[in-house]
UniProtKB/Swiss-Prot annotation:
Annotated binding of [4Fe-4S] cluster 2, by residue: C149, C153, C156
Record-stated family: Belongs to the methylthiotransferase family. MiaB subfamily.
Subcellular location: Cytoplasm
Domain of life: Bacteria
Name the record gives this protein: tRNA-2-methylthio-N(6)-dimethylallyladenosine synthase
Record-linked Pfam families: Radical_SAM, UPF0004
Cofactor(s) this protein requires: [4Fe-4S] cluster
Domain (MTTase N-terminal) ranges: 2-116
GO molecular function: 4 iron, 4 sulfur cluster binding; metal ion binding; N6-isopentenyladenosine methylthiotransferase activity
Length: 439
């Protein structure tokens, strides 16, 4: 039995790709290990959305090269592999092969070649997306429904690393979802770069279907209790989508709405396809349909030419929406993007101050929202149990609206159970609860 160690960086799509890599390698008698020192194969599944993870890659390669077995191979996979290709081999001689994000199913071929590079982004591996393999039962499972991206946001490298957007045929998705349900999955996380644009283009001729249709079909699968998805695009959140999202009882009432900027001028420079008013209108419509909805977002500060007024527009949207989760970053220039070639730059010290102000205000908002949760009840999907000296003391999980809740109780609750809990306190935005009968 050979051993493989996988270091996964970045988004949920990368996590699913790592599962796919394990699926392919299991056919070659590889088994996953958590110790790179004993691995016969070390894979680094990379992210390139920002510069920092790329810099980390070469540090990781150096560390693994020092501790690996003499004959162990190191492979670099994912988005950084897609856009750097053979340059990775030049910079790091200890790397044996490079495998792009659109070429995951070729892993069994490249591990037998020395200095192989497979990074074509026009390779259609949608038919390989669901190589199901036996694994321990998971309460929450990742499920690809599309690959690639057709959007041309001026700051984003993803279209260059993952290629054109292709929707995976619905029959394949439903078949995989049924297998996951039979393996113990209670909650699906659907994945795609523009997940709610599903159905626009398939790899071959298929019946016309949209994202809401897919959600309805997945909801009919016995055993699946909850469905989440990431990452949707605000541009595709039309009235029909929002109304069907609200009506489907199995679709969790939490949604990611990546704002990126609250300034219409900056959004135009980013080529996002919507403006501030459109975004706020979508939020207003959504909250009218689902008042308790949980909304998360992405925000970039310090985008080229972002003025003080532009940043204040972002702060205004933050105040109006009161996002439940905020992923915020200083703009990072990326190769192969339009904005990456622009000479105008917001000084780092200005961007840093803006980010600090944004994040500090969001922390205050979370405290305010957490305080209002005390006394409310939620149904939580149990994810992990807490034990002390062999005694059950509680569990943790997420509510339908995406709130992460730590629960104290004496009775045994198994992962996958749905349990009604009452919020009793909060600490720095974290919610604490007990079961309704306080057992």
């Amino acid at each position: 039995m050979l051993k493989v160690y996988i270091e996964t960086m970045g988004c949920a799509m990368n996590s699913r790709d790592s599962e796919h890599l394990l699926s392919e390698l299991s056919k070659l008698d590889y088994k996953e290990t958590n110790d790179p020192k004993i691995a016969d194969l070390i894979l680094i599944n990379t992210c390139s959305v920002r510069e920092k993870p790329e810099r980390k890659l070469f540090s990781e390669i150096g560390q693994f090269a020092k501790i690996k077995k003499p004959n162990a191979k190191i492979g670099v996979c994912g988005c950084t592999a897609s856009h750097m290709g053979a340059d990775i081999l030049k910079k790091s001689p200890s790397v044996s092969f490079v495998l792009g994000a659109r070429n995951v199913s070729k892993i069994s071929q490249v591990i037998h070649k020395e200095k192989a590079v497979e990074v074509a982004i026009d390779y259609d591996e949608s038919s390989y997306a669901f190589e199901f393999f036996e694994k321990k039962a998971e309460v929450r499972s990742l499920l690809n429904i599309s690959i690639g991206c057709d959007k041309k946001c001026t700051y984003c490298i993803v279209p260059h690393t993952r290629g054109k957007e292709i929707s995976i045929p619905m029959d394949l998705i439903l078949k995989e979802a049924e297998k996951l349900a039979n393996n113990g999955t209670k909650e699906l996380m659907l994945l795609g770069q523009n997940v709610n644009n599903y159905g626009v283009r398939f790899s071959s001729e298929h019946a016309k279907v949209n994202f809401s249709d897919l959600l309805d079909k997945l909801s009919e699968i016995p055993g699946i209790e909850r469905i989440r998805f990431t990452s949707p695009h605000p541009l595709h959140m039309n009235d029909e989508f929002l109304e069907r999202f609200a009506k489907n009882p199995k679709v969790c009432k939490s949604i990611h709405m990546p704002l990126q900027s609250g300034s219409s001028a900056v959004l135009k420079m980013m080529r996002r396809g919507y403006n501030k008013e459109w975004f706020l209108n979508r939020v207003e419509k959504l909250k009218a349909l689902v008042p308790e909805v949980g909304i998360s977002t992405d925000i970039i500060v310090g985008f080229p030419n972002e003025s003080d007024k532009d940043f204040e527009d972002t702060m205004e949207v933050l105040e109006k929406v009161c996002f439940d989760t905020l992923y915020s970053f200083i703009y990072s220039p990326r190769p192969f993007t339009e904005a990456g070639a622009w000479k105008e730059r917001v000084p780092l010290e200005v961007s840093s101050l803006r980010l600090e102000r944004l994040q500090n205000r969001h922390k205050e908002i979370l405290e305010e929202k957490a305080r209002l949760e005390v006394g409310k009840t939620h149904v939580v999907l149990v994810e992990n149990r807490h034990e002390v000296d062999g005694q059950i003391v509680g569990f943790e999980g997420r509510s339908d609206t995406g709130k992460f809740i730590e629960v104290t109780c004496k009775e045994k609750r198994n992962p996958g159970e749905l349990v009604e809990v009452e919020i009793i306190s909060h600490v720095k935005g974290r919610l604490m609860a007990t079961t309704k009968n306080n057992q």
